[in-house]
Amino acid sequence: GIKDVDIRPATLAPELITDLLKGQLGFNGLVVTDASHMIGMFGATVPRSEQVPGAIAAGCDMFLFFNDREEDFGYMMEGYKNGTITEERLNDALHRILGLKAALNLHIHKKEGTLMPPKEGLSVVGCPGHHQIAAQIADQYVTLVKDRENYLPMTPEKYKRIKLVFIGGEGRVIAGQLLKGNDEAIKADVIHQLEEAGFEVDAEEPVLKGKMEEFKKRFDAVLLILSVEGFAQYNVMRVKWNLPIKQPWYMSEVPTIVASLTYPNMLIDVPMARCYANAYMNHPEAVHALIEKLMGRSEFKGAYNDNVFCGRWETRF
């Protein structure tokens, strides 16, 4: 057997790729490494100079993504020169690569000039038909989890003056680059759709909360929107109350309706919410479906399971 200290991620494990997958299971296709930026694959095992050729030696046939093109290519060449990648292993990988290309008729497409579809095909992205489909699907999945105090329906007649509290997410790291999120656009869309529905919306974020009694006189209800999202670089995504005005002190002062536009398990951070819904997505069609259902213009058709309560008794109340 293998000692625990010698266990490697699958991409670097010949006992899995070569012995089990290609040997015992008879897999005759192409094996591509995990993305070489992934910490689970390359973070804490052996130096990258050994990882790069080691992945091919272990049985992978293609290597996905560079850290540095020149350096990684040098690591691969050195692995071939020093025998880490044998001639037999190299030829096997090449045969599998060529075999996949042939199976996909890439040589024919190249000859015919049809490897890439025409740019005109991009015109369908964001077309009216796709937005219509998005709206139809959103109508089916927006879910009401609880409304213990019967705050709904949320109508202008009942709650004309809405205090909007918007909690956004973090920037995203994609292909090694930090990209800014689109929280401001999502927030602006929520405000626009609420105003179109007849509400007066206050989305200001003052430094101080101010007096409770004044808050209750100014607003009929609070709509707390959670659009918390990230990408891969975080192990856990939680609500971050970055300003006092956003912290959920208002839930016992005025009717507060909470809706998550992303993760469905946000009750772990707002267990005190009496009314909570999941919209799952933060695009305009999902926001529209959410508002329509909160207002009682459309029924909630989505379903939830016990995971939304995060295994905690207090989230159910």
Where are these regions (language model features)?
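Catalytic metal-binding/acid-base residues of hydrolase active sites
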Residues: 36-37, 262
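Short beta-strands and strand-loop turn motifs
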Residues: 1-2, 32-36, 225
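Acidic/histidine-rich helix-loop elements
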Residues: 4-9, 37-46
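Alpha-helix-loop-beta-strand connector modules within alpha/beta enzyme cores
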Residues: 10-32
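Short, solvent-exposed loop/turn segments at secondary-structure junctions
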Residues: 1-2, 39-40, 231-233
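Preference for extracellular/luminal or secreted protein segments
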Residues: 13-14, 23-24, 43-317
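Active-site-proximal beta-alpha loop/turn segments in soluble metabolic enzymes
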Residues: 1-8, 118-124
